Amino acid sequence: MYSQQPFPAFAFNAGLMQDPANCHFGGYTGLGHPQPFSFAFSTLKSENGESGVQGMGDCTTPVMPWNSLASFDHQVQMENNQQGNPPRAPSPTLSDSRIKVKEEVVHETDSGEESPEPKYPSPPNPSLYYPNAWTGAPFWQVNPTPGNNINPMPNQTLVKNTSLPGNTTYPTPANQSPNTPVDCVTSSMESSRCSSTNSPNGAINERATTIPNGEMLDGGQSSDNEEEVPSESEMEQFAKDLKHKRVSLGYTQADVGYALGVLYGKMFSQTTICRFESLQLSFKNMCQLKPFLERWVVEAENNDNLQELINREQVIAQTRKRKRRTNIENIVKGTLESYFMKCPKPGAQEMVQIAKELNMDKDVVRVWFCNRRQKGKRQGMPTVEENDGEGYDVAQTMGSPPVGHYALQQVVTPQGYMAAPQIYASAFHKNDLFPQTVPHGMAMGGHIG
């Protein structure tokens, strides 16, 4: 690179302003870097409060350049570089009387103690930097402000470098080890926000250190979360041992069910014990029932009075009153039939309303409708078939012959309901019905007048 000398500005009177159209660019008309030009202002106030006229001989205020980019003096930079001092980049937006920022060293604190992390040295001094017209300011900022902070990447740490101009703070990779050792510490921002998210492996290691020794298993699983679930072979062997122990002690499957009710308050039927021994229950249900049967085996071997307790429980169960069979009167049954013809599968609110009108229990009404639907299925009634919980309305047709060529059969519908459309009711879903076109002169019953 080379230093460029701008064309000297013209001097005008106090009341005139320089015309930028008259400025020349050193005789160069190419598309290269333009020379910085300046405007002359009439009256400016200096930093010390004295006023002067620009363009005159007694003007004490220099001409303000229009080039917003920083430019370096090559000779001064080379002298500073030979003396060991890094080049200092002047800021175009700050005056010469700006306040120098004091160098401060921020120590990382973690619960009042120094961080065990080693201090990272700064990289070597950078070479000369010449900004171009199409580039902005360098990535380090001179005299950074609180609003101009640099957020580090997850694998970077903020390093306070005292050798760069303006005590700049810049991100440095965590795995970098430059040759020049300089006293530098990490910023407090890292300790408060970035220390826990430095790397995903660090979070795993931190979580692993919190687990006590002996609880970590292969694959990162803990032994506390893993319950002892028996395998299918173990469950099959236990069922065989249970049956052998029960037969050898002289207990029946019903006795085992009664014994579980006496000992643990949970009575099981003979069918459940039989299905467990024949491995006909689901594996989940067998796992839930196995602990009770294991305790029963131990109790049957050690307790001699268990058989007496079982016999007493059987007597109590036989003397316990059973629920009487529900008998519905013929009038009530006819009313339920009429409701069933209107809606074969009523909802919960409809069942409650029917139960209130008939002065019956809701469960009785629910069971009656369920039995009535099953009866219709057994009889093969297509009008009562259910498709996804929906039933078809039932319409009774009278067999009277039609009168005239265009007469239709009379349809008798329940009170308060509209008559069913004159279409062919197929066995498909209710929404899948397609109307059938009827030729003129043909009745719905297939009779031609």
From Swiss-Prot:
Regions of compositional bias (Low complexity) in chain numbering: 187-199
Record-given protein name: POU domain, class 5, transcription factor 1.1
Family to which the UniProt record says this protein belongs: Belongs to the POU transcription factor family. Class-5 subfamily.
Location(s) in or outside the cell: Nucleus
Compositionally biased spans, kind Polar residues: 170-180
InterPro entries named among the record's database cross-references: HD (IPR001356), Homeobox_CS (IPR017970), Homeodomain-like_sf (IPR009057), Lambda_DNA-bd_dom_sf (IPR010982), POU (IPR013847), POU_dom (IPR000327), POU_domain_TF (IPR050255)
Keywords, alphabetical: Activator, Developmental protein, Differentiation, DNA-binding, Homeobox, Nucleus, Transcription, Transcription regulation
Segments forming domain POU-specific: 227-301
Its biological purpose: Transcription factor that binds to the octamer motif (5'-ATTTGCAT-3'). Activates transcription when directly bound to the octamer DNA sequence, but can form repression complexes with other proteins at the promoter site to inhibit transcription. Binds to the promoter of the vent2-B gene to activate transcription when in the presence of other BMP signaling factors also bound to the promoter. Inhibits the competence of ectodermal cells to respond to BMP during embryogenesis thereby inhibiting epidermal differentiation and promoting neural induction.
Organism per entry: Xenopus laevis (African clawed frog)
Coarse class of the protein's main subcellular location: nucleus
One Gene Ontology term from the biological process aspect of the record: positive regulation of DNA-templated transcription
Gene Ontology cellular component annotations, sorted alphabetically: nucleus; transcription regulator complex
Transmembrane parts of this sequence: none
